[in-house]
Amino acid sequence: NTDITSNGERVKCMQVWPPIGKKKFETLSYLPPLTRDQLLKEVEYLLRKGWVPCLEFELLKGFVYGEHNKSPRYYDGRYWTMWKLPMFGTTDPAQVVKEVDEVVAAYPEAFVRVIGFNNVRQVQCISFIAHTPESY
């Protein structure tokens, strides 16, 4: 008899995230990079919820960092440059992914994230990395 909690056979297939050399970003950051189909499905989910897609990119650091203070601050790496305007009225996930491709073409060494805004409640509902630079 054991006192260890187990979820059965699945315990054998669980992995530990390597803590060295791996930065955490946004939602889904513990998973491998999204394939094109997975990216389309995430954007489709965002649109199905009625959220407005918006793209942002960051050239230097794609993660939260403490540059000005040792304790966390709201401005340290959280604000990125917006790519064009939010995509109000967009209903096609392929259109959003095409814009991601445009950001990557213009700034290949940038981190690119997709954000979904609820324009009624005026809040950000989802945010995930759509592209990480080759050098990362």
Swiss-Prot record:
Belongs to the RuBisCO small chain family. It is found in: Plastid, Chloroplast. This is Ribulose bisphosphate carboxylase small subunit, chloroplastic 1. The basic functional RuBisCO is composed of a large chain homodimer in a 'head-to-tail' conformation. In form I RuBisCO this homodimer is arranged in a barrel-like tetramer with the small subunits forming a tetrameric 'cap' on each end of the 'barrel'. Pfam families: RuBisCO_small (PF00101). The keyword Nucleus does not apply. SUPFAM superfamilies: RuBisCO, small subunit. RuBisCO catalyzes two reactions: the carboxylation of D-ribulose 1,5-bisphosphate, the primary event in carbon dioxide fixation, as well as the oxidative fragmentation of the pentose substrate. Both reactions occur simultaneously and in competition at the same active site. Although the small subunit is not catalytic it is essential for maximal activity. SMART domains: RuBisCO_small. InterPro entries: RuBisCO_ssu (IPR024681), RuBisCO_ssu_dom (IPR000894), RuBisCO_ssu_sf (IPR036385). Heterohexadecamer of 8 large and 8 small subunits. Residues 1-13 form a transit peptide. GO terms for cellular component: chloroplast. One of its GO terms (biological process) is reductive pentose-phosphate cycle. The keyword Transport does not apply. Keywords: Calvin cycle, Carbon dioxide fixation, Chloroplast, Photorespiration, Photosynthesis, Plastid, Transit peptide.
